[in-house]
Amino acid sequence: GHSAYIISTILARHGFSKSFHIFDSFEGGLSDKTSEDVSDYARQTKEEAEFEKNWFSSTINDLKKALIGFDFIEIYKGWIPDRFPEVESKKFAFVHVDVDLYQPTLDSLKFFYPRLLPGGVIVVDDYGYSVFPGAKRAVDEFLRGTDCSVFYETPMGSCFIIK
């Protein structure tokens, strides 16, 4: 919800009039890690995994409350990529992927990049974070088969993919 609030605030200040689509399970989600998501030094106890899942979850009502007043937001509750068909016919100028894990990151890139307008930007929030190695693996795998105009890794761990 923090990223959605920051992005919404910036968009509102600049007179944004398009739709801002937010996809979230509202169930945490770090419990569905695969071998692609585990770093060698980030092994967890069951208690640590449960804490992590709860740390990254919020309710849809909490999000709606935080984003009240931003009438351009559309929220899709569900798992990635299950809800993507609802926006299959749309084009996107900006996509912010903050899903931490390999498979939903890869699914997001495969779905949104072909629908990205020329010059459009995809930001992958967790690309450079060692605790989320799956995000980097997904981006690197995706880029091997994609001709993007620009790829830029920020010093803060995100990356930008520009079509």
PLM regions with names:
Residues 1-163:
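S-adenosylmethionine/decaboxylated-SAM
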